[in-house]
Amino acid sequence: MDFTNRTARCRLYLSDSLLVNKICKDIQAHLYEKFSPSTIAERLKMNYSYLSRHFKQETGKTITEFINEVKIKEGTRLLETTEMPLIQISTQLGFSSQNYFQTVFKKITGVTPIEYRTKT
């Protein structure tokens, strides 16, 4: 299943659970920040273990996987619509390094950010 289909599939789950909706809205609201699932739990004033377990049961993926997919989706948009250097995109999206951004990007999309940019 390609990257676009996986993100679309996750969106299907959003209407099934109020808590999943809250988590996804929080991720979108803080997309350009460095944060973790435990940060989301703190912001939602919820137990981290419960939050993680519920999200995984409802969506079939971890909160971290979903965060990375949303950030990489935004990364693809930035690669398509801007000339921003990779280091700036990775920093803007809250990745700890350009290398980590590239690793996550390739894992999710199947190509490197440079390959993606040259194809679009």
Identify the residue ranges that each predicted region occupies.
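…primarily DNA-binding HTH/wHTH and HhH modules…
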Residues: 103-120
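Residues within helix-turn-helix
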Residues: 38, 49, 85-88, 98-99, ...
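Short hydrophobic/aromatic patch on the recognition helix
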Residues: 51, 55, 100-101, 105
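Short, Lys/Arg-enriched, Trp-marked, Pro/Gly-tolerant hinge/linker segments that flank
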Residues: 1-25, 29, 38-44, 57-65, ...
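Residues within the alpha-helical elements of helix-turn-helix
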Residues: 43, 92-93, 108
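Terminal helix-turn-helix DNA-binding modules in bacterial transcription factors
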Residues: 24-25, 29, 34, 57-96, ...
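Residues within well-formed alpha-helices
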Residues: 15, 22, 74, 88-89, ...
